[in-house]
C-alpha cells in the first residue's frame, strides 16, 4: 500500500506535539476527573518511537495513566525490533500501567492519518476499574484462548461496584499460509490444487496457525463469558500483506494471541457501529456447498462459487489476480444476521472454483453489496459522539483503499468537534451489545467507543 503522508511536514519534523497538547489541556472542558490523551510518533527508530509515543500521550494528562493502549505499524520489526519499541515505551510509562495493543494497518487521530508510525491512547480516571487479559493460540483453539482471556479480566472485577462495562480486544488476524508445491498467494487455480488447498488451509490454520484468523470465534466465546458487557473486537495485521502480526501485553510481544482490556466505570460508555454498504441486487446468491464452518464457499446456486460471483457482477476472469481482495473491497459479498444487520465480507482468497472469507458466513444467503465514497464517510462520522470526552474506535483497512485521499476529509471533519481521538485501521471488526445478544463480525465496518 502506498504510504499515507500528511499534507504538512511529517510529525517528527514539526516542533508542535508538546505545544499542541499543552494548548488542548488549557482550553479543555471540565471532565470531572476523566482525562484522555493521544500520543503519536513517526520516528523510524523503534526505541525512539516508543519513547515519543508514550511521552506525547502522557503530556496530555495531569495524572499518571490508569491504562495505555499502544498501536504501531509493522515496519518497526526491521528498524530495531518490537522489543526495543516496547522498551522505549516503558522508558517513559509509569511502572505497573496496564498496557495492551499490537500491530495494525494504520491509524487516524487528531494529528492526521498514517500507515507508518505509532499511536497510543492514555486514560486517567479515578472512578474506573481496569483489568487486562490474554489468551494464546487463537487460530488453533479460539475458544480456549477466549476463555483464558475472559477469566483474566473477570477475576479482577469481582469486587467492582460499577455497572457500566466495556471490553476492547485485539485478536491476531489472518495470515497467508505457504504450501510446498503451491507457494503462497491469494489465487490458487486448478481443480486438483484448489480442492487440496481448501483442506490444507483448514489444517494449516488449526495446526500451524497460518491461515484464517478465527477472530469471530474468539468474539463469540468472549460474549458468552461476558454477556452483560459491551465488546469491541479488532483484528491485528501488518501492511495488508498478511505475512505476520503481533500483539502487545505489558512488556511482552506475542503472535496468534488475543489481548484485551476491560473497563468498569460510573461513566456512560456508548458503542456505535455501522458501514456505508447496501445491497446491489435484492436477489440472494444461495450457498450450496461450503467448508471450514462457512469460511470457505465452494458453490453458489450449485455452480462454482467464483464463476457465479464474477458473472453476477459482470467481471471477467482477468480480474482474478493477487490484488483480488482489494478489488472486492468495492463489491464485497454480505449476509444478514438474525436481526437483519448486514455484514460485509470481502473475499480473502480464490481456491480454484471457490473462495474464502476471513470469518464465518452466518447465513447461506449472500448478497452483492456496494457503497459510495460519501456513504462510507457518513458511516464513520455517524459513529462519533460530538460531546465525547474519550473517543476510541476501529475502522476497516479497506476504507483506506476505497476512500483514498478522502480519508483526510474524514479526519478533518472529526477534528472539528473532537480534540483528541484515535481510530485504528484493522483487518476485521467485531461487536457485541448486551441489548442485541448477537456477537457480530464484519469487514469494511466502523465501531467506536465514546465515554462521556
Located regions from the model:
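Hydrophobic alpha/beta core scaffold segments
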Residues: 2-452
